[in-house]
Design a protein with these regions (language model features):
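Conserved catalytic Walker-motif region of ABC-type ATPase nucleotide-binding domains
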Residues: 100, 222, 338-340
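ABC-type nucleotide-binding domain
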Residues: 329-589
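Juxtamembrane loop-to-helix connectors within ABC transporter transmembrane domains
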Residues: 9, 77, 81-85, 101-146, ...
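Transmembrane helix-loop-helix hairpins at lipid-water interfaces of multipass membrane proteins
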Residues: 16-76, 153-158, 269-273
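Transmembrane helices of ABC transporter permease
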Residues: 11, 15-25, 62-66, 133-187, ...
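Helix-loop-helix
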Residues: 46, 52-54, 151-165, 239-308, ...
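An intracellular "coupling" helix at the cytosolic face of ABC transporter transmembrane type-1 domains
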Residues: 105-106, 122-131, 135, 139, ...
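Helix-loop junctions and hydrophobic alpha-helical segments within the transmembrane domains
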Residues: 96, 100, 209, 310, ...
Length: 589
C-alpha cells in the first residue's frame, strides 16, 4: 500500500523537492531567530549606545531579508504544495474511476453506488490533503523539534534532558492513542459511505417514494443511517479530545519544568537569566510543532483510512479481463452459438436463481447469421442472463459462447461490445442533450449522422418540434421525456452504433399501446439484416421472429416458429393461451 501511495509523488517530484527545500528554509529561519536574539542580548546590546546604533542598520537589513525569504517560501509551500496535492488527487481519482470501469457487472451487484462515490470524492480529498501537508509538517516540525532540543541541550543539558524524558513518556501515550484514533476514523469512513449509499438510493427512487407516500419511511431510514454516522463522529471527537488534551498536558508540564528546574539552576548559578529567557522562547518553538503534529493526526488518520479503502479497490483484480494478446472480434456473418453453457451468480439475488442449481444449466443455442430469435419463459428462467453472457457482462462457468466461431473469451471486450447493440426496458439516458445521448452510440458522430439515426428510429419529427431541437436537455435519467421517447432515443443510438448483433431485452414491456406500436416499428427496422435476440413478455411482439425458444431452468426446452410451437402444444402454447384466451393474467420476464 505504501509503495502505491509513494508512486503518486513520482510525477510531481520536481514540485515535491522544491516544496521540501522551502520547508527546510522555513524551519531554519524559525530556529535562527531565538538564537540571534540571545546573541544580541548577551553581546551587542550590552555594549555602548554608539556600537548598538551603528549595528542596527545591518541587523534590520538582515532581518528583513530573512523574513522576506520566509514569506516567499511560505507562499510557495502554501500555493504550489496544494497544487501538487491537487494533481495527485486528480490522478488518484482517474485511477479509481478507470478501475471501476474495468469491473464486470458482478462488482456493481455487490457494491452500492453511494459507497463508490464516497471513495472517489470524500476519501480522495482527505488523502491528498495529507499527501501535501504531512510531508511538509514532518519536515518543518521535525527540524524545529530536533533543532530546538539540540540548541536547548547546548544551553542547559540538565534541563533539556528532563524535557526529553517527559516528552518521551508522553510520546508513548500519544502513540497508543493514535492507534485508537485509526480505528475510530476507519469506522467513521464506513458510516459516511452508509449515508451516501442511503441518500443516493432515496433520491434516485424519489418518484417511487412519493407514489407510495413513503416519505416518512425514507426519513426514518435516513435518520437511522445519520444517527450511526453521528455516533461514529462523537466517538471520533472523543478520541481527538483525549489526544489534544494529552498534548496540552505535555506542554503545561514542560513549562512547569522550565520555570521550576530553570529557576533552581539560575539560583545555583548554573544558568544565566538571558539563557533561561532564550530557553522559554525555544520551549514555544518546541511545543508549537508538537501541537501541529498532534493536530495533523486527524488529517493523517483520515488519509490512512481513505487510502486503505482506495487500495482495496485498486488491488481488486477484475474477474473479467482480456487474455494476453487477445485479438479484436471480426464479425463477418453474425452467427452466435451457446455450447453446453453453465452459469450461476456468485451472490444469488431475487429472481436470479434459488442457489441450488445454475441459472444457466448446460444450455445449447445456435443462432444463424441475420436470424431473429425470441426467448420466452418464466421469470428467473435465465433469459436475461443468457443475453448478459454474450457481451461478457458475466463470464460462463463452463461451456463456451462464440460469434462466427470466435470464443468471446478470446477476443477483446471492447471489440466484442462494439459489435453488439443492446436496447433494454429500463433505458438510461445521461443528463445531457438529446443529440449527445444519441451520439453516445458513436462518439464524434456528425450532426447529419445523428439526425439520420433519429429519423430511422422514428423520433426525428418529435425532436425537431422542440424549441431547442437536438440541444434539448433530457434531465437526469431522461426524466423530461416519456417512456416511448426515451426508448426511441435509445434505439437511435444503436442505429448510430450500427452493430452486427442486436439484443432487445423487453424493450417495449413498459409502454402503452400507442408508444409500443411506434417503438416496435423502430425495432423491426433496426433488426433488419442483423442477428437479433429478443426477450419479451408480450407474445404479440415476437410472432414475427424467425424462431422462438422457450427457456426454463436455464435450458432451452423447446424451439420453433410461432405456428410450430402452437401446434406442438407445449410450454409456449400454454403461455400463449394464458395471454390471448383470457385464462388468467400472466407476465413473463
Amino acid at each position: 500500500m505504501l509503495k502505491r501511495f509513494l508512486s503518486y509523488y513520482k510525477p510531481q517530484m520536481g514540485l515535491f523537492v522544491a516544496d521540501t527545500i522551502c520547508a527546510l528554509v522555513l524551519a531554519a529561519i524559525d530556529l535562527a531567530f531565538p538564537i540571534i536574539l540571545r546573541n544580541l542580548c548577551g553581546g551587542l546590546f550590552t555594549q555602548g549606545q554608539t556600537a548598538i546604533m551603528q549595528a542596527l542598520g545591518m541587523i534590520a537589513v538582515g532581518l528583513v531579508l530573512m523574513y522576506a525569504t520566509r514569506c516567499a517560501c511560505r507562499y510557495f509551500v502554501s500555493y504550489w504544495g496544494h497544487v501538487m496535492g491537487a494533481r495527485m488527487e486528480s490522478k488518484m481519482r482517474e485511477d479509481l474511476f478507470d478501475q471501476y470501469e474495468r469491473f464486470s457487472f458482478a462488482y456493481f451487484d455487490r457494491n452500492s453506488s453511494g459507497d463508490m462515490m464516497s471513495r472517489v470524492v470524500n476519501d480522495l480529498f482527505d488523502i491528498c490533503e495529507a499527501a501535501h501537508h504531512v510531508p511538509e509538517w514532518i519536515i518543518i516540525c521535525g527540524i524545529e523539534i530536533i533543532g530546538s532540543f539540540v540548541i536547548l541541550f547546548t544551553i542547559a543539558p540538565v534541563l533539556a534532558l528532563a524535557m526529553a524524558v517527559v516528552t518521551a513518556v508522553f510520546a508513548v501515550i500519544m502513540f497508543w492513542q493514535n492507534m485508537r484514533m485509526r480505528e475510530v476514523f476507519s469506522d467513521n469512513r464506513k458510516k459516511i459511505s452508509g449515508i451516501n449509499a442511503q441518500l443516493q438510493d432515496s433520491l434516485a427512487g424519489m418518484r417511487v417514494v412519493k407514489s407510495f407516500a413513503n416519505e416518512q419511511t425514507e426519513r426514518s431510514k435516513f435518520r437511522a443511517s445519520n444517527d450511526r454516522y453521528l455516533s461514529s463522529k462523537e466517538n471520533m471527537y472523543h478520541a481527538m479530545g483525549v489526544y489534544t488534551a494529552t498534548y496540552g498536558l505535555l506542554s503545561g508540564v514542560l513549562y512547569v519544568i522550565v520555570v521550576l528546574l530553570g529557576g533552581w539552576l539560575v539560583a545555583q548559578g548554573q544558568l544565566q537569566a538571558v539563557d533561561m529567557a532564550t530557553f522559554a522562547l525555544y520551549i514555544s518553538l518546541f511545543c508549537t510543532p508538537l501541537e501541529t503534529l498532534v493536530n495533523s493526526a486527524e488529517t493523517y488518520q483520515k488519509a490512512i483510512a481513505g487510502f486503505k479503502r482506495m487500495d482495496e479497490v485498486l488491488s481488486t483484480v477484475p474477474d473479467i479481463q482480456d487474455k494476453p494478446g487477445a485479438a479484436d472480434l471480426q464479425v463477418t456473418a453474425g452467427a452466435v452459438e451457446y455450447r453446453d453453457v453453465c452459469f450461476s451468480y456468485e451472490d444469488v439475488e431475487l429472481g436470479a436463481g434459488d442457489g441450488t442449481r445454475p441459472v444457466i444449466d448446460h444450455m445449447d443455442l445456435s443462432i444463424k447469421p441475420g436470424q431473429t430469435i425470441a426467448l420466452v419463459g418464466p421469470s428467473g428462467g435465465g433469459k436475461s442472463t443468457t443475453c448478459s453472457l454474450l457481451p461478457r457482462f458475466y463470464d460462463v462457468a463452463a461451456g463456451s459462447i462464440s460469434i462466427d466461431g470466435q470464443d468471446v473469451r478470446d477476443v477483446t471486450q471492447r471489440s466484442l461490445r462494439q459489435s453488439i447493440g443492446l436496447v433494454q426496458q429500463d433505458v438510461y439516458l445521461f443528463d445531457g442533450t438529446i443529440g449527445e445521448n444519441i451520439a453516445y452510440g458513436k462518439p464524434g458522430a456528425t450532426a447529419e449522422e445523428i439526425a439520420e439515426a433519429a429519423h430511422r428510429a422514428n423520433i426525428d419529427a418529435f425532436i425537431e418540434s422542440l424549441p431547442q431541437g437536438y440541444d434539448t436537455v433530457v434531465g437526469e435519467r431522461g426524466s423530461r421525456l416519456s417512456g416511448g421517447q426515451k426508448q426511441r432515443v435509445a434505439i437511435a443510438r444503436v442505429f448510430l452504433k450500427n452493430p452486427k448483433i442486436l439484443i432487445l431485452d423487453e424493450a417495449t414491456s413498459a409502454l402503452d399501446n400507442e408508444s409500443e406500436e411506434a417503438v416496435q416499428e423502430s425495432l423491426e427496422r433496426l433488426a433488419r439484416g442483423r442477428t437479433t435476440i429478443i426477450i419479451a413478455h408480450r407474445l404479440s411482439t415476437i410472432k414475427h421472429a424467425d424462431e422462438i425458444a422457450t427457456v426454463e431452468h436455464g435450458r432451452v426446452v423447446e424451439r420453433g416458429t410461432h405456428e410450430e410451437l402452437l401446434a406442438r402444444g407445449g410450454t409456449y402454447a400454454r403461455y400463449y393461451r394464458m395471454q390471448f384466451e383470457g385464462a388468467r393474467a400472466h407476465e413473463l420476464d
